[in-house]
Amino acid sequence: MLVLGCLQCFTSAWGFASRRICHSSSATPGQHSVGLGHGYQHGAQSWAERFLLRYKGLLWFVGSRAHSGGEETNGKLQAGGCYSYWRGSLGIYFERGKEHGEPLIITKVEDGNKAADILMAGDEIVNINDQQLLGYRQEAICLVKGSHKILKMIVKRRNDISYRPHSWHSNKLIESAMDTVTPQMSNASPFWNARYRSSSSSHDLSNPWDQTSLQRNSGHFSSMGSMDSIDQTYQFGRLSSAKSNNSIDYVGSQNKRDSAYGSFSASFSTPDHTLSKTASASTENILYKNNEWDNTKLGYGKTSPSMNEVRRSADRQVLQSTSINETSKIQRTEDNTEPRYSGRSNFGPVWNIPDKKKTASPPPPPPPQRSDSYAVTKIHEKPTNLMHLDASSTQHFNVANRSQAKPDWSLEISEQQRPIRAHDRTVADTRRTSNSSYHAGLNADQGLSPYKDKYPSNLPNVSRIQASLSTNDVRFAQPAYNYHHQRQYSDESTLFQSTRTSAQHKSQQQPMKYESSVNQVPSDLTYVYHPHQFRAPATSAGFSSGKQNVENNGQNHFHVVSIKHPQGNTTHHQFKEEENYAPEVNSGRKSVQPENTVISIEIPAYSLPQESFEPSQINCEKNYLKISEKKDNYLGNNEQIINKTTGYSEEKCNDRFSQLDHSEKGSYRSSQDYSWRKEENKITPLVTPMLHSLAQEGRNRSESFPDTGNEKLSFPDAGKQSRRSDRFATTLRNEIQQRRARLQKSKSTAALTESNETETSDNWKQDSLESMSPTSEGSFSSTYRSHLQEAQARVLRATSFKRRDLDTGISDHLSLFQDRNMQISSFSGLSLDPVQPKKNTAVNSSQNVSRIGARKRFTTQQKLMSYSEPEKINEVGVEDQYNFRTENSTKRTVGSFADRWKFFEETSKCAQPKVPPKVVSSSQSEETSEIAINRDYAKSSEGQESKRALAVSGQNPADENGFPDKVTTERRQRLGTFAEYEASWKEQKTQLERKNSGRCHSADNILDADLEQNPKAQYIHERSKSSPTTDFYAQAAAVESKQQSESVRRDTENSNSTHCRSSTGDSPTRTVEAGDQCGATNEQEVLTCNTKWKPHDKSFPIPETSNESQQSRARSGTLPNDYRFAHENVNQGNRDISFSAVPISEACPDFSNADSDQLQDHPSVFKKRSAAPQRPPPPKLENKYWRQNGSSSSLATSSESLLTAQARRAQSYSPSSQDTFPPQSLQKQSPSTYPDKNPSIHIYDYQLSVPPENDRYHLEKKYFESELSSKSHLQIPGMEPSRSPSPQFAPQKLTDKPPLLVPEENLSRIERVIDNTTVKMVPIKIVHSETHAEKESRHNLLSAIEPTALPTGLAKDQLKTLSTSEQSYSRFCAYTRQESREEEESRVTDLYSCQRNAEDDNENDVSSLAPSNAKSKDAIYADLKSEELVREIVDKDKSLADILDPNAKMRTTMDLMEGIFPKDEHLLEEAQQRRKHLPKIPSPRSTDDKKDEQNVPSAVSLTTSSTYYSTSAAKAELLIKMKDMQEQQHIAENSEDELGQNLSEKKQELIDSISKKLQVLRDAKETLLEDVQCNNALGEEVEIIVKEVCKPNEFDKFRMFIGDLEKIVNLLLSLSGRLARVENALNNLDETVSPEERKTLLEKRKLLTRQHEDAKELKENLDRRERTVYEILANYLNEENLADYEHFVKMKSALILEQRELEDKIKLRESQLKCLTDSLPLDRIK
């Protein structure tokens, strides 16, 4: 608490160390040295110094002009810096001012002072920082200290430069009055001090500058008060400086600068208390007369000058409309748009900004000061309600918490100060908006505030409501977003309407206050850009306040304030109209609605035509709201309070309420303050007749206008003032307790919602409860937030990205819904008000959320696109749901398509923040159908979510009840995975939709989400980057192939010549059976393909149907879903065509198969469909990648899916190559070409029946021989989802996918050759990596599988790798022999390159394929042999069991990472491809070279192909095991006698094998490092681009996300590794281990598990941030750069994981090698 009287000493309680400012010894008692050097003896920094330290800037003494017979010195004093300047001591000494009944004169200016040249002793300080002084020294000191960068002093100087007599001071006139007022204010002064904010306007200051006022001012202007209010005000209120228009926000810490800025400069409108209530002719004076001091109390006089202006305007208007006798004065104020500061009114407005009313006012009207611009900015940023709300709520939370935390008025001061700071900004804006109206509002506020202070009941409301609605009213912490300035009302501020609405409601809550607001708002009647994008006339606030005023009856200075147009005249005129009209309005409103009645405010949302406005039954009036049909004439904006108020108005009201709720927090503080004040300052007809009437009016309003939204804020607070006066603090406490109880009830989100609803009702019922909320506000805020946070955490865990599930989101959504409901209700007649208020209530503490829209000044599109708005995140799903609920009504409500669109955006902002619903290409319609189908399919899983997705999706463009995005929304929402989400991003910006899956898409999540997503994402996602599940689901839905995949398709018919109709669709493209599946199997599947191919459709005319499915696949090709889809396709193929794996890539991948050239030609397509790798222009990679997408997706369905399916199935068939071939050939063909060619490739469907033999692993060779028309037919072996082709076929795809890639590569080569021949049928070597066993039986996977003998040597290609364990272990099909596979893969890689060359050369590389197959077979056998060796060695040397067969028991780091980072090997392939594309990377060796090098260690081959490294560690281990097992088998074949003798030999053999594998791993690691380097380089490029195009704050988000991505991945890996080690230790504990040791391990495991879960939550949050960043970047980056970004992000984590995996594998191999070596006799060691 600051003692303003003399500031002899004061201790700042504002969180700083005690600061004392004492009269310097050099200064006379009447003087005060502002200079810090001399300014305080105690050596503590004064607030001024601290402030200056914090806000470094230049000091300026500005302005000289003749004035009042005296010469106003216009001195510009520019100091090098405030700090140094002040540090050196300002050296200006003020003689006592009004405190001593004397003018405030500079008695001394130290020599050498920078001001010495300008200032002279005897100068009377008239204005500081545009704040007219009442003449109080403390006021001047506070203002000086509060100055931010500039110290602007206007001094009156007699011509003779001698001290002027005090009489010269204009305040002299009012001194008596002030003295008189002071006693009146005395009881309030303590409150004032506490509440008085430095940010309060000069008007407010005028009040404070009474002795009482001074006390208040001292608190108000004191560094503590001002700083406190400053910093705190915006901490939450200004959630984003970037969004905030306030200069302070932009400048830096909103709180700091804002506070300092707003509270000291803008807010610091030096109160003109000098003007006696009688002497002051200005409205504010009148208002002061009415309740000048009271108002000041309410406003703390510290409301920013803009608030003062508003207050003045309000005063004028209020006085006019009010019974206040000062109507004439108001008019005069009207004339003087800027209310003259009492006593100082003669002096021109501190601000040089001409006010609209300025012209009228003889003295230059004080335009909003810095704080004004500040306020405006803030205001824009926040809803009017939020101004206070921000201060009290979101700041809110800070402010509310702090202030709430502070029970006393001093706390309240800080709280209010904060709000006031927000207010200051708002006020400044308001002031800027309409000085006169603003001032009128302020005056009204001031008028009210004293009484309110006296009568806390009103005050709490006032604080919420903005003490007299004047944004200036500091006490009421008027919402920063009260737009008193047009700018404030401009669309700039998203929250504008809400803010204004809040203000209005607040105004309504407090008659005086709202009067001010009304004046202010009406002045600024400009349509506000509602946070919900609903623009309502600023007048609506005015109306609300007007209503309240009406309720207040004559005393209520209700003025329907015309919208303050940018033109001051208009505003002026409107104000006059208001003045004239106000009585009518009052009477009319009163007549229309009882005192309690609240006039719903017509706020055209979205600047909708008035006609579109629905009468907004203010949800605030939960119970009922009488809408004044009276159209305020001053509402030049055609804004009519009348029922025309649109649902948006209702929404605004809701927003207001929610904002008010935020304000309520401040109000609660205020209430507390008020409560004690009300005891001291009880509003009574005798003591405070005006306030009493206002209170009565407010009470009536509160009664008539139940606080639905403002449960805390409760408009009834005005009415409550009387009640509170009756109940006082007791009632408040009771209310607080009740509110707390409610909060507790609402601990759960659902509970919160219900509580909020209940509270809303209760609030309406119990205004007092709302009143008591001041105390509970903070608790509510904190408790509510904590509950919300907990709920959010729970929900996030459960729902991942389903923000709608977040309770907080619910609250927000409720607010939005409320708004919409209000619209709907008003529009449809639904009585949503009660519910909405409830929602608002729920949101109240978290009203920050309501600010969601308002915070941002982003355009609607930006808002839609910005997930960066945390508030809106929660709103994503809820709004969608709500939209559906209120879809019809909302549609009705929304007037035009644009409106509907805006509304939709608003509702689905979270879901698709930035992306307007896009209609996809022609295939989109199909997709729509697909979506419908998928929707049906997904509905089972998604249910309402899919509906929301539909709402979001462009499916229902605008025609769907004005929800153009309805379908789109559903689709987006369907996106189960972030990858799909990303895909949707790329494919359709409209599709930006929050991911259903929460955190990284675990395989499970992906699957589930994808099922839903597939329908919506298929066309939505150009590529489901990380969510193959989309395809999988589409497939599952279409074919139910999953179920079939459950059953092993052992009987795969020889591939039927299946023709997949490519985009041309006329000619069946050889899609193998996949084509049929895509085209015929299922619409969804086809749709999926089509979706997948849609991107391709752009480049390749593929039947949209198939394209859809393929697009999904293509997109998901890189994703597990693709694999799953392929898997499903395989199943489908079996069902439909006995085609297994090829479906995706081949069915639809004609495009994939299209020549790499085409791919190159259409890199965008690739980009869309696949992750970055696709983007890379190199057709080969892309082709491969596409084929990979298609085939791997089909053949190598997500490894997880496949593994799962494989585990399910005893056997799996994975002809990876088969898919690959057709797609590539198709790719080779131009879209038109291949259709024309109508290549029908029949891939022989080889059925691998691999009986798993647990004990022995032997390859059972099944040759499915069918004549191989290498060029006539490619027979695709029906393969289980374990369509993992032999590694040789997927040299680049290290996993199953690689095999797919390899087959694709092979196919590509073959097809390319064939394609060269047009409709060439290319024999496709199909490598079935047939693994049916689960991980557990991975080592048992050695069921013998021999490649079917293909006539063309495809049989070799058809080699089926049986590495069940590996396959199960990894998503990738296990390769029978790692080594062989490596060789095979290297061959495949070579073959692939050869194929590429063949494409170019039209050479047929089939021959090369055969060698590759042979190599693959050799590799498989080698692996099997190795596995056998391992088994044999383990059988004979148990000591080596654990190390040689770790998978039996051991858990690996990657096991624990499973699901957290859905593994997409396509990414690795992409990385490799990118790297290979780099000039520095040599192209794969030619097939011939490979053939020559067939004997080269497989490690070399593997290294070349990078397949091995791409293979998961588990996979590698499996391969090794298999190989070892083969060796063991061979050993087993030896007689037992020989075993003993040959054991060492076997060990040596195994050592050799492991050594080779180890070398391969090391080579792979090197390759991986290259990939990492390439990816990092890409990231740097992306970063440079992002930095250039994005805003600094957005770039920071990007950088932080990238940095956190690596950190979180490493954290998860570290924790997973540690946890795996602990679990392995536990699993391997001997029975003899002591219980203590076991307990220790168990505790470690528990701790690590908990930490691991926490890390996973971080990952989920990171995923959300990733979406946010993506949305941001999507606004700036082109598709290619965006694809680069996506690829970089994906690869960053993927490479980290892969690197860790390789390291683990290397360690394992090294340990195995070491153990084996150690176990060998010395003589046997080589």
From Swiss-Prot:
Belongs to the shroom family. The ASD1 domain mediates F-actin binding. Residues 917-926, 1191-1205 have a biased composition (Low complexity). Residues 79-159 form the PDZ domain. GO terms for molecular function: actin binding; actin filament binding. InterPro entries: ASD1_dom, ASD2_dom, PDZ, PDZ_sf, Shroom_fam. Interacts with F-actin. Pfam families: ASD1, ASD2. Residues 1427-1721 form the ASD2 domain. The gene is shroom2. Residues 788-877 form the ASD1 domain. It is found in: Apical cell membrane; Cell junction, Tight junction; Cytoplasm, Cytoskeleton. This is Protein Shroom2.
